[in-house]
A protein has these predicted regions:
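HotDog/MaoC-like acyl-thioester-processing domains
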Residues: 2-19, 102-104, 114-147
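A structural detector for beta-sheet-dominated domains
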Residues: 42-44, 99, 144-146
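Hydrophobic beta-strand-centered segment that forms part of the acyl-chain substrate-binding groove
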Residues: 76-109
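Hydrophobic core residues within well-ordered beta-strands of beta-rich domains
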Residues: 37, 48, 90-92, 108, ...
Length: 147
């Protein structure tokens, strides 16, 4: 069903350097989702990036972001980048390496990059880092371009 929605043009679209369009309800980037992260990505060079500060609603242990939320940050940095470049893509495989606890209430820098491409298959990587450059999580994904 989701692939059919993408092919019909109902998937997330990016414009204005990363601002989400469409129904604006994407959990990661949609501005109209009251529970969403409202990430505002931009393209800088070969990176898709944003900064955010996670609220307490997204914590696991006291003061630490839930791993699923951190995984969402990484996935959006990778998949969203391809969509921002005008390609409709889905995540085929996602792996995450948690290096350090990701804190709640501190500025985080999220970056996604294309590592390699073979036809419709794109390998991507992403990081979540603190303001001082400490990487708290790394992601790698195999994305599939569906159109």
């Amino acid at each position: 069903m989701f692939v059919a929605q993408l092919e019909a043009g109902m998937g997330t679209k990016y414009e204005n350097n990363g601002r989400s369009l469409g129904d604006n309800y994407c959990f990661a980037c949609g501005l109209d989702n009251p529970y969403g992260l409202k990430l505002d990505f931009r393209i800088e060079g070969d990176c898709f990036m944003t900064e955010t500060t996670l609220a307490r609603e997204y914590q696991s242990y006291t003061g630490v972001a839930h791993g699923g939320i951190v995984s969402t940050l990484l996935d959006e940095a990778m998949g969203g980048y391809l969509v921002a470049l005008g390609e409709k893509a889905v995540t085929g495989r996602l792996s995450v390496r948690y290096r350090h606890p990701t804190p709640i209430g501190e500025t985080l820098k999220i970056e996604g990059k294309i590592e390699s491409r073979r036809s419709r298959f794109v390998t991507m990587k992403a990081t979540v880092a603190l303001a001082d450059g400490t990487v708290t999580a790394e992601g790698k994904a195999d994305m599939v371009v569906v159109e």
